[in-house]
Amino acid sequence: MDLLVDELFADMDADGASPPPPRPAGGPKNTPAAPPLYATGRLSQAQLMPSPPMPVPPAALFNRLLDDLGFSAGPALCTMLDTWNEDLFSALPTNADLYRECKFLSTLPSDVVEWGDAYVPERAQIDIRAHGDVAFPTLPATRDGLGLYYEALSRFFHAELRAREESYRTVLANFCSALYRYLRASVRQLHRQAHMRGRDRDLGEMLRATIADRYYRETARLARVLFLHLYLFLTREILWAAYAEQMMRPDLFDCLCCDLESWRQLAGLFQPFMFVNGALTVRGVPIEARRLRELNHIREHLNLPLVRSAATEEPGAPLTTPPTLHGNQARASGYFMVLIRAKLDSYSSFTTSPSEAVMREHAYSRARTKNNYGSTIEGLLDLPDDDAPEEAGLAAPRLSFLPAGHTRRLSTAPPTDVSLGDELHLDGEDVAMAHADALDDFDLDMLGDGDSPGPGFTPHDSAPYGALDMADFEFEQMFTDALGIDEYGG
């Protein structure tokens, strides 16, 4: 079973993220399927950023950020977000308070100049896998503890996100410093050239105009890929570790019914429950099988665990279906930028004077020349009051369980990278099976173990059955699930 779990996550991440740790071998029966996250596994390894970048053109600076993060797929993923209508990000906390003192994000060019001239890049090692002070929860012994498990896993995610975001904020400051110094050097060169041609221009005015024209646009571009890396990689690490535990305890989820407050809770990147086999509803309305397949299509492309529900999935239907893009509806990229802008606008919103606050609240009095980090139609949507995003987050799902005797099991095995049967390879090498085929013709009567039972043998003896270890039954159930067998002998 250990080898099966190891193979399950062998090629989890195509973007360079470490796969979840394997299930520990030789431990006690109540050992969780995966060790506590960041305890001794590969996910605990730090990811240190290189030294701060030098002033280079924005395009080169952007490529440097991708290289430092090991996130070459970042631009393609940003483009992919523009092809989906799902709201993947509104359920995530903005942590806008972390940016209230980030002067480099001010929408006043004079503030950026003052900050850039005084800022010294952080040269100490920056670990973008910093950890919070909340322990990774393990699955409860009984299903009655699933509610507390959901809350504990959410607290762990929020703590890890906040701890990491502080490191990502420092990385963004270093790159914004390099961007500012490049723009300042470019403006100084243009100023010297203009002076040599007899056209005296104010250097400060030229610098502020350049910042207004290029700094905010390039900063938003850097922030977009930086925070996508933060959300995507952290969610992958936590959910795949939780998935490794949950798939080993189907008894906890066979009767689980989950009623969500909003669809955003299910569409969001972070979904603590990957198996809800009893019933999956939003305010009492069952989730359509097509909607779940479309959502799982997105999660599959983002390399996140699929959300499985025996009550929702249609027997024989594929687990994923490409969603249809509706051009007149909000897109995932727009929701993502709303989340990013909440961070980038935090400093200016926090330091705004009362008169400026009035202008911000009244669209007719806004200055057309005011600097900003871009806009999206998602930021202009008039959401109903019961579905409006809140910083405090949505209410926890309402959990219940099916009555005894109504257990539901998945009819389709979870997608894995494990090959069974003729496609099985051992240690990456082709093994000749000709000698093993000879076992099919082997006569077991030669060993004295024919069809006739020996003396003293009682059919269906209960003593040997009761002596079996519970781990044997867990492995047998996992093996039949992997083969897609609903009933023994199916």
UniProtKB/Swiss-Prot annotation:
One of its GO terms (biological process) is regulation of DNA-templated transcription. One of its GO terms (cellular component) is viral tegument. Residues 411-490 are annotated as: Transcriptional activation. Gene3D superfamilies: Alpha trans-inducing (Alpha-TIF) (1.10.1290.10). Pfam families: Alpha_TIF (PF02232), HSV_VP16_C (PF12149). InterPro entries: Alpha_TIF, Alpha_TIF_sf, HSV_VP16_C. It comes from the Viruses. The modification Phosphoserine is found at residues 18, 353, 411, 452. Residues 12-37 are annotated as: Disordered. The record marks 442 as: Critical role in activation. SMART domains: Alpha_TIF (SM00814). Keywords: DNA-binding, Host nucleus, Host-virus interaction, Phosphoprotein, Transcription, Transcription regulation, Virion, Virion tegument. GO terms for molecular function: DNA binding; molecular adaptor activity; molecular function activator activity. It is found in: Virion tegument; Host nucleus. Interacts with VP22. Interacts with gH (via C-terminus). Interacts with the virion host shutoff protein (vhs). Interacts with VP11/12. Associates with the VP16-induced complex; binding to host HCFC1 activates VP16 for association with the octamer motif-binding host protein POU2F1, to form a multiprotein-DNA complex responsible for activating transcription of the viral immediate early genes. Transcriptional activator of immediate-early (IE) gene products (alpha genes). Acts as a key activator of lytic infection by initiating the lytic program through the assembly of the transcriptional regulatory VP16-induced complex composed of VP16 and two cellular factors, HCFC1 and POU2F 1. VP16-induced complex represents a regulatory switch: when it is on, it promotes IE-gene expression and thus lytic infection, and when it is off, it limits IE-gene transcription favoring latent infection. The transcriptional activation region seems to target many proteins of the RNA polymerase II transcription machinery. Belongs to the herpesviridae tegument protein VP16 protein family. This is Tegument protein VP16.
